[in-house]
Amino acid sequence: MARIAGVDLPRDKRVEIGLTYIYGIGLSRAQEIIAATGVNPDTRVKDLSDADVTALRGEIESNYQVEGDLRRLESLNIKRLVDIGTYRGRRHRMGLPVRGQRTRTNARTRRGRRQTVAGKKKAPGK
């Protein structure tokens, strides 16, 4: 099993798809990496030679921020927005949509589940 950037790539998938299991690498970036290293994209991960794995690992580590470094960078960017008090920072802090989406309805993913509110009790019928 090939281990790149701390992630075990699935053995039976094509290299192109296997690389997308690394946080920060999507399909187009995986294709760029494969083109730069000269690895055949149709090769299965289990069929990669040690030289291929080393080439892929070197390309990713030298030219891309992935996994923990990328997560840390994103959290620092959000923290910076919160600290300087921008509108986007306030939205992050309040747990609301940041990019101008409506909140009167929808936005359930960002706001979380509905909070139930106790309704008025019905008066006993006569």
Swiss-Prot record:
Region (Disordered): 92-126
Keywords: Ribonucleoprotein, Ribosomal protein, RNA-binding, rRNA-binding, tRNA-binding
Record's signal peptide: none
Similarity comment text for this entry: Belongs to the universal ribosomal protein uS13 family.
Quaternary context: Part of the 30S ribosomal subunit. Forms a loose heterodimer with protein S19. Forms two bridges to the 50S subunit in the 70S ribosome.
Free-text function comment from the UniProt entry: Located at the top of the head of the 30S subunit, it contacts several helices of the 16S rRNA. In the 70S ribosome it contacts the 23S rRNA (bridge B1a) and protein L5 of the 50S subunit (bridge B1b), connecting the 2 subunits; these bridges are implicated in subunit movement. Contacts the tRNAs in the A and P-sites.
Name of the protein: Small ribosomal subunit protein uS13
Gene (name only): rpsM
